[in-house]
Amino acid sequence: MNILRRAVPAGRQAAALDTADALQTGRRALPALGRSPWPRFLLAVSVLAASVLLATSVGPAGIPLDATVRIILSHLPGIEMADTVPPLWRDIIWEVRLPRVLLAGLTGAVLAMSGATYQGVFRNPLADPYLIGVATGAALGATAVIVSGAPHAWHGLSLLPLAAFAGAILSVAVVYAVARVGNTLPTTTLILAGVAVASFSTAITSYLMLRSTTHTLSVFSVVLGSFNTATWGEFTWTLPYVLPAAAVILLHGRLLNVLSLDEEQARQLGVDPERTKLLLLGAASLATAAAVSVAGTIGFVGLIVPHAVRLLWGPDNRRLLPMSLVCGATFLILADLAARTVDQPAEVPVGIVTAVCGVPFFLYLLRRARLGAFW
């Protein structure tokens, strides 16, 4: 909690955080947190686990659910299962489908959690990694490395997320600088600045794709978003970036509640708003960049999921962030399942599926913004 100013006594710091939490939840007393969130959280985790098993079992080669469970369990350390599953099924599940499903889940979790973070930091319900240009900026950074022919890894560490992170940070800095009006961030200017930055990044990415025909397929996957080339390597490469970023965000849920107040009020409560914003924006952008570097630009996950969670479980970021993470993973796993089964044997880019779900929802939210009926 070093972001809390040292001039504020520890007792006042705790009281300040409780005050912000109470204002965020709309309750006068917070210690009991109303009803326990654990049953609902465990239910969401159970739905996520069921989605993983379903998506891993369903495909052109249908595999029974019990066989899928046996195959997964047999690869876990310390568990021995009778080898009664055909080798072909084992290869399909472990080498093809499971890496794809887990990468889709990781990407959905990251995008949803980052979307909730951006919405809290900007105090704007339409902030989203895709809408404010962060995802397209990250895609531009990753594309620049791909077409340059530079090494994609250094001592086992993937460099694509770092390049994507540079593009994401530059994009969010430009959007924030252009859209800010005094101490406020109006919805209209935020969306317009995001559209401008996203359009510019997409134009440069398209130009690089046209100039480098040998890397067209790789860049195409980054632009549209797809998991059809997912591997265990891509999944593990993202973890060193995603896990620390997620830990930072989840541990600062209370401070994100404080940021929902006016900046001057936050300072009076002992919080340094600018340092907190920079930390959370950096963590959210790093996580988004890591996801974009392996999955491409997938829109509207960071918009749909946090709002759905907020409607069901309230705006308290201590609940909103972890629930967005779990629900985002479930949403993108099911979206990817639809993308690869709706038009078999062809496959639809998952970004198209999320756009079909997200655009009507975005228009609905935009209308509510005009009516001032958000939080």
What are these regions (language model features)?
Residues 2-375:
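Alpha-helical transmembrane segments in inner-membrane proteins
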